[in-house]
């Protein structure tokens, strides 16, 4: 679609994949949405096509998750359309000892949508694994 319609048209469709409904509907986040939409629209078409194709064509790594032996934190937004909770939970169960954190009111870009929650969860995780490395 990007090749034929261009970034401006496609970027409107991408926003609900990247961001949760809370972010997309919050009046106080209007400037943030505008900035992100502008960034999406300014992406080069060729690079975006290659990146999208890479995501679609990549091989799954689920079978390899069980070999991870390092402390692992999986973060998912409760409004994530790109990687829904059930996929994140599946990864969590596949990685022994991993921690799964759900960010309330966030989609796939939880670090932008709810940075305070993400930083809190990340800080707690890092505190627990202090000395591991």
Residue ranges and their predicted role:
Residues 68, 74-76, 80:
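Short beta-strand/loop motif that positions the catalytic acidic residue
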Residues 81-87:
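Conserved alpha/beta-hydrolase "acid-adjacent" motif
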Residues 66-67, 92-94:
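Solvent-exposed polar/charged
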Residues 14, 52, 91, 118, ...:
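Hydrophobic "lid"/C-terminal helical patch
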Residues 45, 85, 112-115:
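Conserved loop-to-helix N-cap of the C-terminal "lid" that shapes the substrate pocket in Rossmann-like
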Residues 69-70, 97:
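Active-site acidic short loop of glycosyltransferases
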Residues 7-67:
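Conserved alpha/beta-hydrolase catalytic His-Asp/Glu region
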Residues 96-133:
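Catalytic active-site module of serine/aspartate enzymes centered on a nucleophile-bearing elbow/loop
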């Amino acid at each position: 679609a990007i090749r034929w319609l261009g970034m401006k048209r496609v970027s409107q469709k991408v926003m609900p994949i990247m961001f949760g409904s809370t972010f997309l509907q919050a009046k106080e986040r209007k400037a943030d949405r505008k900035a992100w939409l502008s960034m999406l629209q300014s992406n080069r078409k060729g690079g975006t096509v290659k990146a999208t194709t890479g995501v679609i064509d990549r091989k799954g790594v689920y079978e390899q998750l069980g070999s991870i032996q390092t402390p692992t934190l999986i973060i998912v937004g409760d409004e994530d359309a790109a990687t829904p909770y059930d996929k994140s939970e599946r990864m969590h169960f596949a990685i022994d000892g991993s921690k799964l954190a759900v960010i309330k009111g966030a989609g796939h870009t939880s670090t932008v949508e709810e940075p305070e929650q993400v930083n809190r969860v990340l800080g707690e995780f890092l505190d627990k694994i202090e000395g591991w490395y």
